[in-house]
Amino acid sequence: MEKYLTKMPIKSKANEVPKEEAGVKKETPKVARKATKKDTPKELKDKENAGDDNTPKQTKGRPGRPAAKRKNLDTPDVTEKLAMEEENPPKRRSSRLTRSTRSMAEDGSPSPEKEKPEKLPFIKYKGAIKYFTESQDIAASADDVLQWVEKQKDEVVPMAFDMEWPFSFQTGPGKSAVIQICVDEKCCYIYQLTNVKKLPAALVALINHPKVRLHGVNIKNDFRKLARDFPEVTAEPLIEKCVDLGLWCNEVCETGGRWSLERLTNFIAKKAMDKSKKVRMSKWHVIPLDENQLMYAAIDVYIGQVIYRELERREKVKIKNEEEFKEKNGDAAFKAMKALGETFLTKINEVTL
């Protein structure tokens, strides 16, 4: 009976989904929106970079660069070029040590471009220091020195001269406070002028004595200041007969430029000076001077006397060598040698032109 029955299709309800249609997933609205969204310029550039096979992956904020082709180092041309560079390396400027400077550093020798300054021994003064503060004592001491000068047989008696005074950045230089002189390397005289209203006549006569040759570095300005502070002193006669050691050094040694006492001491005496700023800028008008001030003042005139004697010796040697050279070789050869920069501080017997 059942085989004669026909199966009738069963009508589905309106809310039911057929099995075939249920297997197919509908695209979600979110995906649909992404598909229809317009790409930004950055995204378009990323897509272009991603589609290029010869460029690396795009990094944030930097454009992509094409991959460099690797050189084949096995080619004959490249091999020959590398061999030539190994034999004759190219010259390069570098801040690193070169072979020569490196070997010099290992040996401990200084570089020729920048040699280390020579270390000179400091001056040690072991002579007497005679220090006076009162007007009558200064007058008596100056009179003793004056009598000693008159007893000398030499026509010229060199005397180192220097001055000290206080200085303030608010008020400027103070009145001349100290005069120091040296006529013999074994004794220096220091006269403090704080209690002196007028320079003693014996001291004025001493510095103006016709046999006395006052010398120092920048000494002319010292005389001008002394004349401003003490009207009984006239600067011009002292300036006319004094010797500036820096200018004299330029004449004898044929050097140039301006000299300080410290540099002149290094060059002529081969000694170093302890020019302490604390002592140099100290209160020179305060009585009494301490040991550091006394030694500072004494060394200034002591080394001045030493420099004078050495320049005097060199000048005599130079004059003698020049005269002997002229006698043997003539004036033409002498002028030629001077043009070449010869100073004649050392003896030259013969020259071939």
Swiss-Prot record:
Pfam families: DNA_pol_A_exo1. GO terms for molecular function: 3'-5' exonuclease activity; double-stranded DNA 3'-5' DNA exonuclease activity; metal ion binding; nucleic acid binding; single-stranded DNA 3'-5' DNA exonuclease activity. The keyword Transmembrane does not apply. Disruption phenotype: Females are sterile. Hypersensitive to the topoisomerase I inhibitor camptothecin. Highly elevated rates of mitotic DNA recombination resulting from excessive reciprocal exchange. Its main location: nucleus. Changing D229V: 20-fold increase in levels of mitotic recombination, very limited 3'-5' exonuclease activity. Residues 1-119 are annotated as: Disordered. The keyword Manganese does not apply. One of its GO terms (biological process) is negative regulation of mitotic recombination. Has exonuclease activity on both single-stranded and duplex templates bearing overhangs, but not blunt ended duplex DNA, and cleaves in a 3'-5' direction. Essential for the formation of DNA replication focal centers. Has an important role in maintaining genome stability. Belongs to the WRNexo family. This is 3'-5' exonuclease. It comes from Drosophila melanogaster (Fruit fly). The lineage of its organism: Eukaryota, Metazoa, Ecdysozoa, Arthropoda, Hexapoda. The gene is WRNexo.
